[in-house]
Each structure stands twice: as structure tokens, then as C-alpha cells.
Amino acid sequence: MNTKEIVNKYEFKFNKNLGQNFLIDESVLEDIIEGAEISKEDTVIEIGPGVGTLTKELLERAKEVYSIELDGDLIPILQEELKEYNNFTLIHKDALKINFNELMENKDSIKLVANLPYYVTTPIISRLLTEKCDFKSLTIMIQKEVAERINAEPNCKEYGSLTVLVQYYCNTKIIRKVSPNSFIPKPKVDSIVIKLDRLSEPRVRVKSQKLFFNVVRSSFNMRRKTLWNSLKSLNIDKESMENAFERAGIDPKRRGETLSIEEFGKLSDCIYDIL
């Protein structure tokens, strides 16, 4: 059965508070599966399985699938629809409260697939990356504007701290755009399927990741300010900051959105050296 048929079969009522929009376009499902590159060696962690339409396709291809679902009304539907699969584990929990490192422990070749409510997208991605969860890739349906921020390059308005965070740890690839007509109920925004391939090592080697991300966040907190003014929040004396900018070869009159990840790394290392 397709998504609409399962929804009608169980007379499922959508929960607006959970931001539920279920994918009904089978061509998008196929592109997610193809883009995620799932094989029998892979353990898949799926966040937001809905009524299990995509989950079935994952179960056919993966070694095992762990699906995380918050809505208690969907649990019996998923249990019934997927009862024939012995490689399926359903976790009834808020993904924001999951210990992903614990879930991924002693599992090989972990790939994540997610169709999340848009309000939890950034927190989930941030946690998976900053907590150094051991996964190979994340294929995710997200709001178009968020995908554009993740995939941005310097010198554009979309480029920001989220861009740097994701691209520090991952290569990014947009798989396809998805219109509101591909969902029930229809969301008010366009969506994009994007894949994040985890790098074996961070894109740049820095002396302190904590300082690196502090510099990045401070640089984007007030986008229209120069780096010199933005980085005053670090509470470093004027002479030391002048020295750090000079050693990094970066003009303090530039704005954060003009710096590449490599330049952020160079600047944070020079600041680290003077602390």
C-alpha cells in the first residue's frame, strides 16, 4: 500500500504540533533510496518514518533498520505494517533526546535517513556532527532555505555558521528539489533532499575545535559588522587581536560571510597562539 492508502486504512489524524507532512510522491522516495546508496552491509537509522512507506524500501535493502518515531499514534501502525521484517527495530522516542552514540555502538557502516519536521532539522544535524557520531552519511529531506544554507559558499547571504559546521565535517550534495504537492498535508514551503557524506577527517585541522566554532559563531552573530567588531565578544585585548589578524593574513575589516572555512581555521589558530 502507498502512503495515502495506509493513512486512510488507519484513519490517521495528522498532528500539527509535530509538524507532520508525509511524502506521497514515489519518485521522490526512489531518489532518496538511490541517493542514500543503501546496501546489505549497512545499518540504517531512520528518523521520522511516518507510516513506513520509505521504511519498507530501506528494510528490503539494508542489513537492519532502526526507526525513531515520536508520535505514539504511529507506533501501532508501524508495528502492524512492518511486522514481517525481522531486521526492523522501532524506537518510540523523541529524536532530540536519543543518545545517538549509544545507539550506533558496535554497528558497522551506519547511514542515516531522515524526513524531519523542519523545526528540529538544525538541532538534529548539529547534534549528530558535534557529538562526533560515527555515521557514514545522512540523507535528509529539509526545508529548501536550510538546504541552501548548508550548501552555500562564501560571499552569499545563505553562507553562515550552519554552513561552516556542516561543511567542516561533511561533503554536501543536493539530490533533488521537492514541491509541496509531494506531501500530505501540503507544507507551505519547498523542500530539498540533501546528502551529507561524513569526511574521514574534518575539512581543516585546527588547534582547538571549541575556539574555531566560537570564532565562527561570533563572526556571524551580527552579519553586517566587520570581523574586528564581531570578534570583540571573545574578550581578547586589542593588541593581541591585531597580531592574530596580521599573522593570519586576514583584513579585520572583512565580514564573516567572506571567509572560507580554511580562513576561519587559520584565524582561529592564530588567535589560539596568542591566548
Curated annotation (Swiss-Prot):
Location relative to the cell? Cytoplasm
Its keywords, alphabetically, are: Cytoplasm, Methyltransferase, RNA-binding, rRNA processing, S-adenosyl-L-methionine, Transferase
Q: Which PROSITE patterns match?
A: RRNA_A_DIMETH, SAM_RNA_A_N6_MT
What gene is it encoded by? rsmA
Q: Name one GO molecular function term.
A: RNA binding
* Role according to the record: Specifically dimethylates two adjacent adenosines (A1518 and A1519) in the loop of a conserved hairpin near the 3'-end of 16S rRNA in the 30S particle. May play a critical role in biogenesis of 30S subunits.
Task: Supply the name of the protein.
Answer: Ribosomal RNA small subunit methyltransferase A
| Annotated positions binding S-adenosyl-L-methionine | 21, 23, 48, 69, 94, 115
Enzymatic class: transferase
Q: Which organism is it from?
A: Clostridium botulinum (strain Okra / Type B1)
